[in-house]
């Protein structure tokens, strides 16, 4: 008596479909599925070893060869 039967759940599902509409429920399902997929991909990226992450860094040579386009003021007023 305390538990809900399959008929109770079908009636609740029918009422929810009537209130929100099937198009909105389909959009919610699609958004939820995309969020779960993104979460799983994020967890896989977090599991990569630290050695692989370090290989993606750019090498640092120490010297950079560039030409300045304009001279910066030395008055301390950097607006």
Swiss-Prot record:
Domain of life: Bacteria
Keywords noted in UniProt: Cell inner membrane, Cell membrane, Membrane, Protein transport, Translocation, Transmembrane, Transmembrane helix, Transport
UniProt key word Transcription: no
Segments of skewed composition (Basic and acidic residues): 66-79
One matching Pfam family: TatA_B_E
Membrane topology: Single-pass membrane protein
GO biological process: one example: protein transport by the Tat complex
GO molecular function: protein transmembrane transporter activity
Subunit structure: The Tat system comprises two distinct complexes: a TatABC complex, containing multiple copies of TatA, TatB and TatC subunits, and a separate TatA complex, containing only TatA subunits. Substrates initially bind to the TatABC complex, which probably triggers association of the separate TatA complex to form the active translocon.
Family matches, as NCBIfam families: PRK02958.1, tatAE
Protein name: Sec-independent protein translocase protein TatA
Source organism (scientific name): Paraburkholderia xenovorans (strain LB400)
